[in-house]
Curated annotation (Swiss-Prot):
GO terms for biological process: cell division; epithelium development; heterochromatin formation; imaginal disc-derived wing vein specification; mitotic chromosome condensation; regulation of gene expression. Its main location: nucleus. Keywords: Cell cycle, Cell division, Chromosome, Coiled coil, Cytoplasm, Cytoskeleton, DNA-binding, Mitosis, Nucleus, Transcription, Transcription regulation. One of its GO terms (molecular function) is DNA binding. The lineage of its organism: Eukaryota, Metazoa, Ecdysozoa, Arthropoda, Hexapoda. GO terms for cellular component: centrosome; cytoplasm; ESC/E(Z) complex; nucleus; polytene chromosome; PRC1 complex. This is Centrosomal and chromosomal factor. Residues 21-145, 208-320, 361-380, 392-465 are annotated as: Disordered. Essential protein required for proper condensation of mitotic chromosomes and progression through mitosis. Binds to specific polytene chromosome sites, many of which are shared with the posterior sex combs (Psc) protein. Involved in maintaining Abd-B repression outside its normal expression domain. It is found in: Nucleus; Cytoplasm, Cytoskeleton, Microtubule organizing center, Centrosome; Chromosome. Residues 24-71, 81-136, 221-320, 396-412, 450-462 have a biased composition (Low complexity).
Length: 550
């Protein structure tokens, strides 16, 4: 019985089935002894069945059954007495009739139960006989017709788990392989960002399309595909209209004109993000208006110059539009050349040209004290993103507009050169991972620009930005050795076989520096820092033999 109970424990259905099979076997044994009267046997069986099936109700039912049995025994004793000696005293006859009435009531109740029981018995006999035909059971305890509980899911149980109390089943640990679980988890939709309010989502998408806060999303892509000559013509047209409007120089008209031009400027912002050199004189004049309160005399002289310039431009445009279009198309072509070089990099680095062309928006945000783009991802998660984004975007945009012409006018340098940190590091926590970490040696972002130092700008600027005094050599070597530069993992592996051991190299350089400071020139271990990369015999023909995985 123990094994059968263990198997039956899995399933309440299999439990009841096994119990009925057991009772059927007992019934067969009982039916072989048919000497008992059938009513008694059925009573006995009814007691048994009710005991097994409803263990909770058992006490109450047993009381009922005992009452019925007593009444039946009365009936069995009294009925023959009634029939044989009808000449007995009236007293006993009255008592007998009373008991007979009670017994008749009980009888009608019993006959229904008996009919139900007989039907059950017949069914159980049939099932039992078919069972014994199919698989003759060696022990009456186990019924092999019930299929075992088979479950394909793999469950492990921890070895030291305490055994469950009897009648409870073991709590299975359903083991999912962690890799699979991690994959499915990463494919779920995030509960945070997707639940942004509809308003916040709309606002953030509108700021995207305006191209102000983040380098142009949809509109920027569309503009990039448009031919650059049409963009140039559009810029020239806007410039002529702006110049006609600007010939009255009163302040209130300037303010009205700002309102009027803001729509044009919004449409041109995405163009600026992609073609910065092409900045039409419209935007420059607009920015100068903003600055006029501070430097009025200088701005007025500049503006008169620019007005004459743009006037001649507009006249030539009216005379022969082809020549002016060609003149601006040349600017656009120069910008597009740089743009292609940048796009090639951006395709590899997954950076927006907006970031790469205006890195000083980075500096502007740093200088203004509140990093505008700072907690963007956290704000999106907490849901407060939509409210702040647009305002901070406009603020940052105006800051950039004010700072840019100042830089261009005061010292006529190109905007400060790109350094690896401001490119690879956006200040959201996910961007700490460089996102190109699997691309090969060519992806090193400094290599593109430092190898071709444009007009000495790279060597001059990267000294101020990056490694400080260490850069003092040629621009190329300095920028490649910049301390902040991170190389990708594969590239580091690929270098490792051809490089001197890093500790040894550092030690030799430190020795050289110390010796130079002490003034001994007698022993210079490999090189002075200036000629380091150029003339050093760094054992590059030897493979590096070392067990260090540095």
């Amino acid at each position: 019985m123990t094994m059968a109970a263990c198997y039956a424990n899995y399933d309440m259905s299999s439990l009841s089935h096994g119990m009925s099979a057991l009772s059927a076997l007992q019934q067969q044994q009982q039916q072989q002894q048919q000497q008992h009267s059938q009513t008694q046997q059925q009573h006995h069986h009814q007691q048994q069945q009710q005991h097994m099936y409803h263990a909770a109700v058992a006490a109450h039912q047993q009381q009922l059954l005992q009452q019925q049995q007593q009444q039946q025994h009365h009936r069995h004793h009294h009925q023959p007495a009634n029939t044989s000696s009808s000449s007995n005293s009236r007293h006993s006859h009255a008592a007998a009739t009373q008991t007979q009435v009670a017994a008749a009531v009980a009888n009608s109740r019993q006959q229904q139960q008996q009919q139900q029981q007989q039907q059950q018995q017949q069914q159980q006999q049939q099932t039992a006989s078919s069972n014994s035909n199919a698989a003759p059971a060696p022990s009456p305890q186990k019924d092999y017709s019930i299929p075992l509980h088979v479950d394909c899911s793999v469950e492990y149980e921890l070895p030291n788990q305490p055994k469950p109390p009897a009648g409870q089943r073991v709590e299975p640990l359903l083991m999912i392989h962690p890799c699979y679980f991690r994959k499915m988890e990463s494919q779920r939709r995030s509960p945070f960002v997707n639940n942004m309010h509809a308003t916040a989502r709309a606002v953030s998408s509108s700021s995207l399309s305006s191209g102000a806060a983040l380098g142009g999303g949809g509109s920027g892509a569309a503009v990039a595909t448009a031919p650059s000559s049409s963009a140039a013509r559009r810029g020239a047209r806007a410039a002529t209209s702006a110049q006609q409007q600007q010939q009255q120089q009163q302040r209130y008209q300037q303010q009205q004109q700002q309102l009027r031009q803001q729509h044009q400027q919004m449409s041109q912002m995405s163009q600026q993000a992609h073609y910065p050199q092409q900045q039409s004189s419209l935007v420059r004049q607009h920015q100068q208006q903003q600055q006029q309160q501070q430097q009025q005399q200088r701005a007025s002289s500049n503006q008169s110059q620019r007005q004459s310039q743009s006037q001649s431009q507009s006249q030539s445009h009216a005379a022969n539009s082809a020549a002016a279009a060609a003149a601006q198309a040349s600017i656009a072509a120069a910008a597009a050349g740089q743009w292609d070089q940048l796009a090639a990099l951006a395709a590899r680095t997954a950076l927006t040209p907006h970031h790469m062309l205006h890195p000083h928006s980075h500096y502007a945000a740093k200088g203004s004290g509140g990093g505008a783009g700072g907690g963007k991802r956290d704000a999106m998660i907490s849901g407060s993103y939509g409210q702040t984004a647009v305002a901070s975007g406009k603020l940052q945009q105006s800051q950039v507009q004010q700072q840019q012409p100042q830089q261009q006018q005061q010292h006529c340098l190109p905007p400060p050169p790109w350094d690896a940190t401001s490119m690879l590091m956006d200040r959201s926590p996910m961007a700490t991972v460089p996102s190109n970490y699997q691309a090969g040696p060519d992806t090193n972002p400094m290599r593109l620009y430092s190898a071709t130092p444009t007009a000495g700008a790279a060597s001059g600027g990267s000294a101020s930005v990056g490694g400080g005094g260490a850069v003092s050599g040629a621009g190329a070597t300095g920028a490649v050795n910049t301390a902040t530069d991170k190389l990708s993992g594969k590239y580091r592996q690929y270098l490792r076989s051809q490089r001197m051991h890093p500790y040894a190299a550092a030690a030799s350089l430190n020795l050289a520096a110390a010796a130079a400071a002490a003034g001994q020139t007698s022993f210079v271990p490999f090189s002075s820092a200036a000629t380091a990369v150029a003339a050093t015999p760094t054992f590059q023909h030897l493979p590096q033999i070392s067990c260090y995985n540095v």
